[in-house]
């Protein structure tokens, strides 16, 4: 019967013996809005017709309604949502609320990328889709792409990538690949990316990254099981370099293709030491970036700002996030 459970990954999803997958979170969607929300308008655009994949673009209303002939050029944020590679979308109320707040606070253009999720589409599909989206975004660099908002308003000398949890993991890998594959013309820089923001990044390893990381068997087993479901073909499990970015000696961060990095961690997040470890490893590498910051929110857990976006600490996170994009000191 369809009600027979094969695997229970609550609170994320349930897999039934029939093969049906029931996602328990992140399936509700909200439409984009041409009516300003917090001073921001949005619309959805297809970036991969072959796979029927879209992204949501956010633009400050004042830029959208500017009557001057000279287009208003703004920093460009490309955002990858979290959800363990398993749940959530770029169109959920959670991410629509966050991106609207971030764009309002930072006065930027934002592209929120939707990608195919595991287990139906295991790793590396999410990376492949994200790369396709990033290339689509950069097709507008000369002002002649298919999307007018990017042609008119995106300043490609100020491109920022960001994401939370699994989206932060994707952000890291896209930035490495952008430098390696020379995403941008050399007239800007080879990667085309000015900076990245990793919010509560989902990195992991079979053994603790330091003596402060949790050794709780249940917690470690759960985190590893999420990765195993997302990437069943990883021969090294959670020591796969896709997830074991911090501890793995095979991962060289010196090639990170950006000049500025902000790592945001939360004190009570099981992933907190991975975020600190990334910051430390990058700082000790031969990376030639200019800015490397880490911010820890005390007393809060994983993606607390998405669960309670109206809290004071969530507002502080958005303020710091936006300040990094604006170049605030």
Swiss-Prot record:
Q: What species is this protein from?
A: Arabidopsis thaliana (Mouse-ear cress)
Name by which UniProt lists this protein: Probable carboxylesterase 13
Q: What is its EC number?
A: 3.1.1.1
**Which residues does the record list as N-acetylmethionine (modified residue)?**
1
Which SUPFAM superfamilies does this UniProt record tie to the protein?
alpha/beta-Hydrolases (SSF53474)
InterPro entries on file: AB_hydrolase_3, AB_hydrolase_fold, Carboxylest/Gibb_receptor, Lipase_GDXG_put_SER_AS
Residue ranges annotated as motif Involved in the stabilization of the negatively charged intermediate by the formation of the oxyanion hole: 81-83
Q: Which UniProt keywords apply?
A: Acetylation, Hydrolase, Serine esterase
Top-level taxon of the source organism: Eukaryota
Q: What GO cellular component is one of the record's annotations?
A: cytosol
PROSITE patterns per UniProt: LIPASE_GDXG_SER
Under the GO molecular function aspect, what terms does this record hold? carboxylesterase activity
Reaction catalysed by this chain? a carboxylic ester + H2O = an alcohol + a carboxylate + H(+)
Q: Which residues form the active site?
A: 165, 269, 302
What's this chain's function?
A: Carboxylesterase acting on esters with varying acyl chain length.
| Similarity comment: family membership | Belongs to the 'GDXG' lipolytic enzyme family.
According to its UniProt record, in which tissues is this protein expressed? Expressed in flowers.
What are the top taxonomic ranks of the organism? Eukaryota, Viridiplantae, Streptophyta, Embryophyta, Tracheophyta
